[in-house]
Amino acid sequence: MQCLMDHIVLNVKNEERMIGFYSKVMMFAPERVEEYRAGEVPFPSVRLNSDTIMDLFPKKIWQKSDRAGQGLENLNHFCIALSKGMWEKLLKRLKANNVDIEEGPVPRWGAHGNGTSIYFRDPEGNLIEARYYEGHNSKEKCLLKS
């Protein structure tokens, strides 16, 4: 079966801090942020690529849900694949924003074979892996695409 990742949802405690991290450090385009701030939509999002978004659920949504926190103990990390050039720029932004690299650069196997990865956490402790694959076009912004 072939499919696309449509979205991932993070339950967040401080949505403004998370919007800032994912839009300024990770360079994911913010979506519906002004509408969220105006109370017109229930949560903001950031776009990873043309097919995938990350929804940032504020506490008022996930605290009242019967499913709040379910599965959190099962999520180890998520991984984004970048061109080598974008990966190197991310390293600089992480350093400039005092984000600690927990591991890496290290070789890792993934969806496109062997790549080079780093691991770090967002402001609320979610573990993120960022990798590049040798030989991919360095002008590509993000390899997560259909």
Show the residue positions of the predicted features.
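Core segments of cupin and vicinal oxygen chelate
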Residues: 2, 10-54
